[in-house]
Structures are given as C-alpha cells and as structure tokens.
Amino acid sequence: LLVRPGSLAKVDGLRELWGANRRQVVAVEGDLSEPRLGVKAAWIRQHAGKIDHFFHLAAIYDMQASAESQRKSNVEGTRQALVLAKALKTGCFHQVSSIAAAGLYEGTFTEDMFEEAGALDHPYFQTKHESEGIVRAEKRLKWRIYRPGMVVGHSVTGEMDKVDGPYYFFETLRSLSKVVPEGLPLLMNKAGLLNIVPVD
C-alpha cells in the first residue's frame, strides 16, 4: 500500500478495518508526484517479479482543484504508476479511472469506448481521459481499467470517509421531501439516470 510519509499512521487503522496484519498489508512510503512514485530502488529490486496485481487508485477527484494539480496527480501520477509497475514486473496493472473519462458524452458510454468521449472542457474530464489513454497505450503490461460512476458509502452500513459528490444532491432531496406532499409523483426523464456505485 503506497502511503505518503505523513499518512503512515493511518495504515494501522486500515489494517484493523480490513482484519489484516502487517504482513498482509505492507506500507510502502512514496509520493504520487515523484518518479516511480518515490519508491526506493532497493524496495523495487527486492519485490520485482513478486507482485501479481498493481492497483492504481490515487487521483484528485475534486472538481474545484486547479488544472495543474489535477494534471500532476491524474496524468503524471498514472504515468509514474505504470513506470513503477513495469519496474516491479507486475502481472497486471489495474487503474480505477472514472466515468468522467467519457467527458460530456450523451448516452451510454461502454467499457470498449474511449475515442468517442464527448467534450472534455473541464480539467477533471480531460485528465481522467488522458490518464486512461496512457494506460490503454501500454504494450508491455497487461492492464484493466475500471470506470465507476459516483461512489457512495458501503451498501450495508452506509459508511463513507468523505462527503462529496452525490451527498450534496441527497441533501437537496431531503429538503425537497419536506415541501412536496408524500405520494406525489415527480416527472423524471431518462437523461436523469445516475450511475451510483457503493464503495464495496
């Protein structure tokens, strides 16, 4: 588990949450903005060929973040994650992207689609699309890309570590329920469907 030096203390809490020990979840100091994610060469040599699956989930998904910070994390971070995965001779690189890579595409954007993306005017859309392109162009490493829509809390407990995205919409719905009579049907159109995925 790649961890910034300032976040090492959080790993114990994650181990406890996952029911794992220190051998099962190993904290590796690194930094998304550094070459090979800042992982020490000695660690890479020691673990080369021993890692079957490399999961890259790190990104900035704050729609208000600057274009520069999104590019640094989402594009360059992905590029360096691939460099590290190749140095480790990883079996398969897994990228958790976002449906934002589709831009403002109208309709259903399937797993096989990429070039068909709609307008990529927002830095988040642009950087998620570009980072996927970097992975898709990779020839030396097997890879898989996952595009969740809006990620919400656990499907059973509702637990979530960050309130953003759809949670603001849920608050609006709660407010609306106080003024709209119970049982009153609301007109909705098909374009209003949302892809919401529980974190688990």
Describe each PLM feature range:
Residues 1-60, 67, 87:
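N-terminal Rossmann/SDR dinucleotide-binding element
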Residues 53-57, 64-72, 76-123, 143-144:
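Conserved Rossmann-fold NAD(P)-dependent oxidoreductase catalytic core, especially the SDR/UDP-sugar
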Residues 60, 98-121, 136, 151-162, ...:
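Active-site "gating" loop of Rossmann-like NAD(P)-dependent oxidoreductase/epimerase domains
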Residues 87, 118-149, 154:
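Active-site Tyr-X1-5-Lys
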Residues 145, 195-200:
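Conserved loop-to-helix N-cap of the C-terminal "lid" that shapes the substrate pocket in Rossmann-like
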